[in-house]
Amino acid sequence: MSAPLPSSDALAKIGDLAAGAGLRRVHLLSWRDLEDVEAGGSEVHAAEVARHWAAAGVDVTWRSSFASGHPSVAMRDGYRVIRRAGRYLVFPRAALAELTGRHGPSDGLLEIWNGMPFFSPLWYRGPRVVMLHHVHAEMWQMVLGNDNPTLAKVGDTIERR
């Protein structure tokens, strides 16, 4: 359930700020989409940000991993959602899609950290920001420890740095 949009004056101010910064097209990268069965507060917040930006006239594309039972490309609340790749391959494939311009041009990038980063400072040349909702700490070991202890250690190490 979405909260009401800000007033038209507030949306106009958001649009003016974005335009003044040269941000007409923004790409958002996240591990999961709002439609993922494991979506939580991070995805709800990101969806509200994307909805507000779209209502303010910003062209928003949200790239995430595949969500079972949902199309790979869809429109939601005025912004485009692209769901491709699995739980772990979304990170390198999203970066490759950005490098090749597969999802169109962008003037800025919002990277949502949900444990593992997309490492956008290494490959994105333009304005970018990271949104970090929480750290996972011991969750790495609890979730991945038995199945993939190496990946659990890598995730924990990256998050701590």
Question: Which residues make up each language-model segment?
Answer:
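Membrane-proximal helix-turn-helix segments that form the acceptor-binding/catalytic region
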Residues: 148-161
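A short, glycine/small-residue-rich beta-strand->loop->alpha-helix junction that serves as a flexible
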Residues: 31-45
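N-terminal strand-loop element at the rim of the active site
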Residues: 4-19, 23, 32-36, 52-86
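An aromatic- and histidine-rich active-site surface loop
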Residues: 90-94, 98, 107-139, 155
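Local beta-strand N-terminus motif with an aromatic residue
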Residues: 23, 105-107
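A short acidic, helix-capping loop that chelates divalent metal ions and anchors anionic groups
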Residues: 35, 138-142
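A short, charged, and often flexible helix/loop element on the N-terminal side
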Residues: 72-102, 141-147
